[in-house]
Amino acid sequence: MLYYVLVFLVVALVAGALGFGGIAGASAGIAQILFFFFLALLVISLIASAIRKA
């Protein structure tokens, strides 16, 4: 489960860098959507991991 958390974090950071940094140009909106989507998946994975350990 921690593996997925790290994968989602990396993908969210990359999508955020592309979306907010202006590198993506025309697809900045898509990058922002992906950023928040994977950020939500990261939070869900962290919560699920914490619940399983408890």
From Swiss-Prot:
Keywords: Cell membrane, Membrane, Transmembrane, Transmembrane helix. GO terms for cellular component: plasma membrane. It is a multi-pass membrane protein. The chain crosses the membrane at residues 5-25, 29-48. Its main location: membrane. InterPro entries: DUF1328 (IPR009760). The keyword Transport does not apply. The keyword Transmembrane helix applies. It is found in: Cell membrane. Belongs to the UPF0391 family. This is UPF0391 membrane protein BMEI0373.
